[in-house]
Protein backbone atom coordinates (compact mmCIF):
# COMPACT_ATOMS: atom_id res chain seq x y z
CA UNK A 1 0.00 0.00 0.00
CA UNK A 2 2.80 2.38 0.86
CA UNK A 3 4.40 1.74 -2.55
CA UNK A 4 1.11 2.45 -4.33
CA UNK A 5 0.77 5.76 -2.46
CA UNK A 6 4.32 6.71 -3.38
CA UNK A 7 3.86 6.10 -7.12
CA UNK A 8 1.95 9.36 -7.87
CA UNK A 9 4.55 11.35 -5.94
CA UNK A 10 7.41 9.68 -7.80
CA UNK A 11 5.61 10.28 -11.11
CA UNK A 12 5.23 14.00 -10.40
CA UNK A 13 8.90 14.28 -9.39
CA UNK A 14 9.95 12.42 -12.54
CA UNK A 15 7.89 14.68 -14.82
CA UNK A 16 9.29 17.76 -13.08
CA UNK A 17 12.83 16.57 -13.71
CA UNK A 18 12.07 15.90 -17.38
CA UNK A 19 10.50 19.32 -17.78
CA UNK A 20 13.45 21.08 -16.17
CA UNK A 21 15.88 19.13 -18.35
CA UNK A 22 13.98 20.12 -21.51
CA UNK A 23 14.05 23.80 -20.54
CA UNK A 24 17.81 23.66 -20.00
CA UNK A 25 18.35 22.15 -23.45
CA UNK A 26 16.54 24.98 -25.26
CA UNK A 27 19.13 27.62 -26.19
CA UNK A 28 18.44 31.24 -25.37
CA UNK A 29 18.21 33.10 -28.68
CA UNK A 30 17.02 36.57 -27.79
CA UNK A 31 17.87 38.43 -30.98
CA UNK A 32 17.19 42.14 -30.55
CA UNK A 33 18.28 43.48 -33.94
CA UNK A 34 18.84 42.21 -37.46
CA UNK A 35 20.80 44.22 -40.02
CA UNK A 36 20.07 43.22 -43.62
CA UNK A 37 22.61 44.16 -46.28
CA UNK A 38 20.80 43.93 -49.61
CA UNK A 39 23.19 43.94 -52.59
CA UNK A 40 21.33 42.98 -55.78
CA UNK A 41 22.92 42.67 -59.21
CA UNK A 42 24.27 46.04 -60.33
CA UNK A 43 26.49 45.05 -63.29
CA UNK A 44 29.77 46.77 -62.39
CA UNK A 45 29.63 47.03 -58.59
CA UNK A 46 30.15 43.42 -57.49
CA UNK A 47 33.83 43.77 -56.59
CA UNK A 48 33.00 46.83 -54.51
CA UNK A 49 30.21 44.93 -52.75
CA UNK A 50 32.72 42.28 -51.69
CA UNK A 51 34.89 45.05 -50.27
CA UNK A 52 31.87 46.56 -48.48
CA UNK A 53 31.17 43.19 -46.86
CA UNK A 54 34.81 42.79 -45.80
CA UNK A 55 34.74 46.28 -44.30
CA UNK A 56 31.60 45.43 -42.34
CA UNK A 57 33.28 42.24 -41.11
CA UNK A 58 36.27 44.30 -40.02
CA UNK A 59 33.99 46.43 -37.84
CA UNK A 60 32.19 43.37 -36.47
CA UNK A 61 35.46 41.61 -35.62
CA UNK A 62 36.43 44.58 -33.47
CA UNK A 63 33.15 45.30 -31.68
CA UNK A 64 31.45 41.89 -31.78
CA UNK A 65 27.72 41.22 -32.03
CA UNK A 66 25.51 41.78 -29.00
CA UNK A 67 22.06 40.25 -29.45
CA UNK A 68 22.15 41.19 -33.12
CA UNK A 69 22.56 39.39 -36.42
CA UNK A 70 23.84 40.51 -39.80
CA UNK A 71 22.31 38.93 -42.91
CA UNK A 72 23.57 39.61 -46.44
CA UNK A 73 21.87 39.10 -49.79
CA UNK A 74 24.49 39.28 -52.54
CA UNK A 75 24.05 38.78 -56.27
CA UNK A 76 27.23 37.00 -57.34
CA UNK A 77 26.20 37.22 -61.01
CA UNK A 78 23.24 38.39 -63.06
CA UNK A 79 21.52 35.02 -62.52
CA UNK A 80 22.79 33.81 -59.13
CA UNK A 81 22.64 35.12 -55.59
CA UNK A 82 23.19 33.90 -52.06
CA UNK A 83 21.86 34.72 -48.62
CA UNK A 84 24.38 34.35 -45.80
CA UNK A 85 24.93 35.37 -42.20
CA UNK A 86 28.05 37.04 -40.85
CA UNK A 87 28.98 35.57 -37.48
CA UNK A 88 31.94 36.30 -35.23
CA UNK A 89 33.87 34.17 -32.75
CA UNK A 90 36.97 35.40 -30.92
CA UNK A 91 37.30 38.30 -33.33
CA UNK A 92 37.13 36.14 -36.46
CA UNK A 93 34.18 36.55 -38.85
CA UNK A 94 32.73 33.70 -40.88
CA UNK A 95 29.98 33.54 -43.48
CA UNK A 96 27.28 30.91 -43.12
CA UNK A 97 25.33 30.27 -46.32
CA UNK A 98 21.60 30.21 -45.59
CA UNK A 99 20.14 29.98 -49.08
CA UNK A 100 21.21 30.09 -52.72
CA UNK A 101 19.09 31.58 -55.51
CA UNK A 102 18.92 31.00 -59.24
CA UNK A 103 17.47 33.89 -61.24
CA UNK A 104 16.01 35.68 -58.22
CA UNK A 105 13.19 38.03 -59.24
CA UNK A 106 14.36 40.85 -57.01
CA UNK A 107 12.87 43.55 -59.24
CA UNK A 108 9.32 42.29 -58.67
CA UNK A 109 7.12 42.68 -55.62
CA UNK A 110 6.66 38.91 -55.32
CA UNK A 111 10.37 38.16 -55.67
CA UNK A 112 11.54 40.86 -53.27
CA UNK A 113 8.86 39.89 -50.76
CA UNK A 114 10.21 36.34 -50.86
CA UNK A 115 13.79 37.49 -50.23
CA UNK A 116 12.72 39.67 -47.30
CA UNK A 117 10.65 36.83 -45.85
CA UNK A 118 13.70 34.54 -46.12
CA UNK A 119 15.75 37.06 -44.16
CA UNK A 120 13.02 37.40 -41.56
CA UNK A 121 12.61 33.64 -41.14
CA UNK A 122 16.36 33.06 -40.71
CA UNK A 123 16.95 35.98 -38.35
CA UNK A 124 13.73 37.01 -36.65
CA UNK A 125 14.25 40.05 -34.42
CA UNK A 126 12.49 42.78 -32.50
CA UNK A 127 13.86 45.47 -34.83
CA UNK A 128 15.28 45.46 -38.35
CA UNK A 129 17.53 47.77 -40.37
CA UNK A 130 18.24 47.72 -44.09
CA UNK A 131 21.26 48.70 -46.17
CA UNK A 132 20.66 48.83 -49.94
CA UNK A 133 23.74 48.89 -52.15
CA UNK A 134 23.36 49.35 -55.92
CA UNK A 135 22.90 52.04 -58.53
CA UNK A 136 20.31 54.64 -57.58
CA UNK A 137 17.63 56.32 -59.64
CA UNK A 138 16.01 58.52 -57.02
CA UNK A 139 12.26 58.69 -57.57
CA UNK A 140 12.39 58.16 -61.36
CA UNK A 141 10.33 55.10 -62.37
CA UNK A 142 11.91 52.29 -64.37
CA UNK A 143 9.70 53.08 -67.40
CA UNK A 144 11.07 56.62 -67.40
CA UNK A 145 14.63 55.34 -67.35
CA UNK A 146 13.90 53.24 -70.45
CA UNK A 147 12.79 56.36 -72.29
CA UNK A 148 15.92 58.18 -71.16
CA UNK A 149 18.08 55.28 -72.34
CA UNK A 150 16.83 55.86 -75.89
CA UNK A 151 18.68 59.19 -75.92
CA UNK A 152 21.98 57.35 -75.33
CA UNK A 153 23.32 59.53 -72.51
CA UNK A 154 27.01 59.49 -71.74
CA UNK A 155 27.67 57.82 -68.38
CA UNK A 156 30.38 58.47 -65.84
CA UNK A 157 32.55 55.50 -66.78
CA UNK A 158 32.86 56.75 -70.37
CA UNK A 159 34.93 59.71 -69.21
CA UNK A 160 38.64 59.21 -68.69
CA UNK A 161 40.69 60.50 -65.75
CA UNK A 162 37.66 60.79 -63.46
CA UNK A 163 36.83 58.67 -60.39
CA UNK A 164 33.94 56.24 -60.73
CA UNK A 165 30.72 56.75 -58.80
CA UNK A 166 27.55 54.84 -58.16
CA UNK A 167 25.84 56.80 -60.87
CA UNK A 168 22.09 57.19 -60.96
CA UNK A 169 19.90 55.21 -63.32
CA UNK A 170 21.44 51.76 -63.26
CA UNK A 171 22.82 50.15 -66.40
CA UNK A 172 19.83 48.21 -67.73
CA UNK A 173 16.15 48.32 -66.84
CA UNK A 174 15.80 44.59 -66.16
CA UNK A 175 17.88 44.99 -63.00
CA UNK A 176 16.15 48.11 -61.70
CA UNK A 177 13.59 48.10 -58.89
CA UNK A 178 10.90 50.69 -58.25
CA UNK A 179 11.01 52.39 -54.84
CA UNK A 180 7.30 51.58 -54.50
CA UNK A 181 8.11 47.90 -55.08
CA UNK A 182 10.51 47.98 -52.13
CA UNK A 183 7.87 49.71 -49.99
CA UNK A 184 5.17 47.18 -50.90
CA UNK A 185 7.50 44.23 -50.33
CA UNK A 186 8.47 45.45 -46.86
CA UNK A 187 4.81 46.02 -46.03
CA UNK A 188 3.91 42.53 -47.29
CA UNK A 189 6.40 41.08 -44.78
CA UNK A 190 5.09 43.19 -41.92
CA UNK A 191 8.42 44.98 -41.66
CA UNK A 192 9.05 48.55 -40.55
CA UNK A 193 12.75 49.30 -40.56
CA UNK A 194 14.50 51.35 -37.91
CA UNK A 195 16.37 52.86 -40.83
CA UNK A 196 17.02 52.30 -44.51
CA UNK A 197 20.49 53.30 -45.64
CA UNK A 198 20.75 53.76 -49.41
CA UNK A 199 24.36 53.30 -50.49
CA UNK A 200 23.27 54.61 -53.88
CA UNK A 201 23.18 57.92 -55.70
CA UNK A 202 20.32 60.41 -55.58
CA UNK A 203 18.12 58.49 -53.12
CA UNK A 204 17.34 61.27 -50.63
CA UNK A 205 14.58 62.86 -52.70
CA UNK A 206 11.32 63.82 -51.02
CA UNK A 207 9.47 61.58 -53.47
CA UNK A 208 11.47 58.49 -52.45
CA UNK A 209 11.09 59.36 -48.76
CA UNK A 210 7.33 59.76 -49.21
CA UNK A 211 7.03 56.34 -50.87
CA UNK A 212 8.88 54.76 -47.91
CA UNK A 213 7.18 56.72 -45.12
CA UNK A 214 5.22 53.73 -43.78
CA UNK A 215 8.06 51.16 -43.86
CA UNK A 216 10.95 52.95 -42.14
CA UNK A 217 11.46 55.33 -39.26
CA UNK A 218 14.60 56.92 -40.68
CA UNK A 219 16.06 57.32 -44.16
CA UNK A 220 19.81 57.72 -44.66
CA UNK A 221 20.66 58.72 -48.22
CA UNK A 222 22.55 61.14 -50.42
CA UNK A 223 21.14 63.85 -52.75
CA UNK A 224 24.14 63.54 -55.09
CA UNK A 225 26.34 60.82 -56.54
CA UNK A 226 28.15 58.40 -54.22
CA UNK A 227 31.67 57.24 -54.97
CA UNK A 228 31.78 53.73 -56.35
CA UNK A 229 33.43 52.19 -53.27
CA UNK A 230 30.38 53.16 -51.18
CA UNK A 231 30.06 53.91 -47.49
CA UNK A 232 32.99 53.42 -45.06
CA UNK A 233 31.50 50.35 -43.39
CA UNK A 234 34.61 49.61 -41.34
CA UNK A 235 33.81 52.81 -39.44
CA UNK A 236 30.02 53.16 -39.55
CA UNK A 237 29.67 49.44 -38.77
CA UNK A 238 30.90 50.16 -35.26
Which residue stretches match the model-derived regions?
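Short, solvent-exposed loop/turn and secondary-structure capping segments
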Residues: 48-49, 82-84, 140-146, 208-209, ...
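A short, glycine/acidic-enriched catalytic loop
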Residues: 137-188
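Bacterial N-terminal signal peptides that target proteins for export
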Residues: 1-8
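C-terminal motif of bacterial Sec signal peptides marking the signal peptidase cleavage site
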Residues: 17-20
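Structural recognition of the beta-strand scaffold that forms the well-ordered cores
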Residues: 34-39, 69-74, 128-132, 194-198, ...
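N-terminal extension/subdomain marker
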Residues: 22-126
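Solvent-exposed loop/turn segments at secondary-structure junctions
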Residues: 41-44, 76-80, 104, 134-140, ...
